[in-house]
Structures are given as structure tokens and as C-alpha cells.
């Protein structure tokens, strides 16, 4: 991003909210629409688009209260994974752990809506959190906002044998907030794009994003099926850069399978990302799991993992169940991280392809299961054979 251009835009009297280098955009806020007309007339500005409108008379919304803590999770001594054992065993991620690959030396960014009580829950205190950043509201407390990201984090990072062990328990984490749970506007894709670039700047290896968009408060912005080509939505274009930057992006397919939309949601339509659908613990498709393919006929979702009755940590510090591709994605993300740790010579795109090729439906992929349930141990063995 050319600093001179950003400064000239700022000098028009607007506040710069975020910038994006990869897609060459600047997001600004102002109270006077004529300022946008002046910016649009600048010789280096290609186009402008309204991505957010402030609620009348309201200050930015943020959470201040916290859910009460119990912090008395049950212990299940039969497995270090606790009740979450089946959601990692289904893809043989536990065999990677037994081989010594638990995410050591790898960094994961979780881009989500908030991480409620993750800083207070006793069972999560040994998760290696390197830092946090809020792209929605710098004055907000990321640990007081939505519980969604906290439950997502628990699927990957929990490291309490007998209570719950996640799919990459020894990885390190950046917790980034890009989703504003109080509204649905295009600006959240701007926040997300900035979060992805920040993750790249701090050395992240793998990203999980259990977010997706197709409908907005401004209905004129809603997506149509033809928009699912990996190029229409800003998130999808940004996501398509991630592997070229040396990171693997794992994202949720969406939960629209039972509604009128049914399809995956951006950024899940992007190229060179792993889009994850949801199954139950018997490997049967969750009815809500969004389906593909993309508008340009690429296979989506890529793979599936447990997302119906997934085991998570709740905001009270005890175990619970959750449904959604929001949880199949991080379960897969952690295993992908451990696989890449085991196969350090591979590029991001090669890791993604290795995971696809290990799926139990690799010979007949479809728009429901994609390439199926990956076998992470088989993927590792295939890597060793080809070295």
C-alpha cells in the first residue's frame, strides 16, 4: 500500500479504519458524504463502495459483562482427549500426536467474533496465546465479546489430558477479531482482510476462520450463486492470496444446508483454501452443512470433519457440545497444522493438496462431502514415500 496515497486520502478529512495491501484498498469513515466524492475524484482511486452505515444515535456496541464461571470440567481418564476423542480419531490425527507432531513450533491465527472468557477459563490457561488484536473496535475487550471464537479455539488448543485435548495442543496462537456480531455489513470483510495481513506479518503458519457471509443488513449487497467464483467477494479474493504468502487457510463451509441458500459462503469459495463441511461422529453428513460446488465448477467443500455434536469448552469453563461447520473447521485446522509440522518441506498449496488426496472420497469427490474424511496419518506416510 502506497503510504503517499493513504496520506492523501486521510487529508481529505476522513478517518482511515483499515488498509489492505494485497487487494489495494483503504477503508475510511466520515460523517460527510461529499468527502467520499472528493476521494473518488483522486487520480489513483479506481472506485468507492459504501460498506457500513452507523446506527442512528448509537455509539459502537461492545460487550462489557462476563458469563459466570464454574471451572469444574469432568475428567475422562480413558483418553487424553476426553470426550473429544472421536473427533480427532476419525481422521487419525491422534496418530500424528503419537508420532510427536502436536503443533510444536507452529503458529495458528484464529480470526473470529470474540473469545469470551478464554483468559479466565482455568482449563485454557496453558494455551500458548502470543497476542490478540481487535479490528472491529480497538476499545473493546476481545475476551468479553462473543463466545464463538473461544469455543473454536478450544477445539484446537486445549491441552488438558482427560478433560480435553485439541487437535494442535502445542501450537501457539494469535486471537484476532474481525466479526461484528451486532450487525452484518461488508466492512467486516475489510476487517477480516486486514486481520489476514496482520497474521502474515507476525509469522502465522495456519489460519482458521469460522466465518462466512452471503446476506447483509443492506439487502442490495446480498450474494447470489453466480458470485461464488472466488473472485467476487473481497474475502474470497484475499483468501486466494493466502497460500501464495506461505500460509494455509482453513475455513468453515457454512451452515445453510437446510435453508434456501444451501451453498457454501465466502471465503469458502476461494481457491487454494481448505473449506470444511460438517459430519457427525458416525461420518454422516450434518444436515446443515453447506454444499458446493463453486459457480466456476470447483469442488467444494474440500473435506469434512466432525461438526455435529462437536466437543468444546463452554464459557463457564466446563465441557459442552456445539453444532456447526464453525467447529469442523478448527478440528481440521489443528490436524492440518500438525501434518505441516510433520512435512515441513511442503508449500502451503502442497499441504492442501496432500490433505485432499488423503480423503476417503478422493476418487469420486462431490459437492456434499468434497474429498471426504481425510486420513492424516496416511497423508504423512504418502509424504514420506515421496521424499
Where are these regions (language model features)?
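C-terminal subdomain of the subtilisin-like protease fold in secreted/lumenal serine endopeptidases
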Residues: 85, 202, 206-208, 341-387
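Substrate-binding/access-modulating region of protease and related hydrolase catalytic domains
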Residues: 97, 159, 175-269, 295-298, ...
Amino acid at each position: 500500500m502506497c503510504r503517499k496515497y493513504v496520506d492523501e486520502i486521510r487529508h481529505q478529512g476522513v478517518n482511515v479504519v483499515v488498509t489492505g495491501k494485497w487487494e489495494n484498498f483503504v477503508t475510511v469513515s466520515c460523517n460527510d458524504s461529499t468527502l467520499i466524492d472528493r476521494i473518488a475524484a483522486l487520480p489513483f482511486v479506481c472506485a468507492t463502495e459504501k460498506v457500513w452505515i452507523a446506527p442512528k444515535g448509537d455509539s459502537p456496541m461492545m460487550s462489557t459483562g462476563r458469563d459466570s464461571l464454574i471451572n469444574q470440567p469432568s475428567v475422562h481418564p480413558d483418553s487424553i482427549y476426553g470426550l473429544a476423542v472421536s473427533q480427532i480419531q476419525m481422521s487419525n490425527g491422534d496418530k500424528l500426536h503419537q508420532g510427536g507432531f502436536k503443533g510444536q513450533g507452529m503458529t495458528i491465527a484464529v480470526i473470529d467474533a470474540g473469545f469470551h472468557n478464554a483468559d479466565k477459563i482455568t482449563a485454557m490457561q496453558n494455551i500458548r496465546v502470543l497476542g490478540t488484536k481487535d479490528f472491529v473496535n480497538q476499545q473493546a475487550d476481545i475476551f468479553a465479546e462473543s463466545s464463538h471464537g473461544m469455543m473454536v479455539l478450544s477445539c484446537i488448543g486445549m491441552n488438558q489430558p482427560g478433560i480435553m485435548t485439541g487437535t494442535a495442543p502445542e501450537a501457539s496462537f494469535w486471537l484476532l477479531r474481525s466479526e461484528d456480531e451486532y450487525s452484518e455489513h461488508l466492512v467486516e470483510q475489510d476487517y477480516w482482510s486486514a486481520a489476514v495481513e496482520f497474521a502474515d506479518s507476525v509469522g502465522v503458519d495456519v489460519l482458521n476462520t469460522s466465518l462466512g457471509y452471503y446476506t447483509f443488513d443492506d439487502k442490495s449487497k446480498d450474494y447470489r450463486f453466480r458470485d461464488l467464483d472466488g473472485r467476487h467477494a473481497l474475502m474470497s479474493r484475499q483468501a486466494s492470496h493466502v497460500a501464495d504468502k506461505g500460509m494455509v487457510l482453513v475455513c468453515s463451509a457454512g451452515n445453510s444446508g437446510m435453508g434456501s441458500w444451501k451453498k457454501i459462503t465466502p471465503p469458502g469459495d476461494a481457491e487454494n483454501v481448505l473449506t470444511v463441511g460438517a459430519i457427525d461422529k458416525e461420518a454422516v453428513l450434518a444436515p446443515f452443512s453447506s454444499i458446493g460446488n463453486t459457480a466456476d465448477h470447483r469442488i467444494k467443500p474440500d473435506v469434512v470433519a466432525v461438526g455435529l455434536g462437536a466437543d468444546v469448552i463452554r464459557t463457564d469453563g466446563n465441557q459442552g457440545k456445539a453444532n456447526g461447520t464453525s467447529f469442523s473447521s478448527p478440528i481440521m485446522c489443528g490436524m492440518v497444522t500438525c501434518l505441516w509440522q510433520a512435512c515441513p518441506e511442503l508449500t502451503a498449496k502442497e499441504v492442501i493438496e496432500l490433505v485432499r488426496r488423503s480423503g476417503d472420497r478422493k476418487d469420486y469427490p462431490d459437492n456434499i462431502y468434497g474429498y471426504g474424511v481425510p486420513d492424516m496419518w496416511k497423508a504423512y506416510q504418502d509424504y514420506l514415500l515421496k521424499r
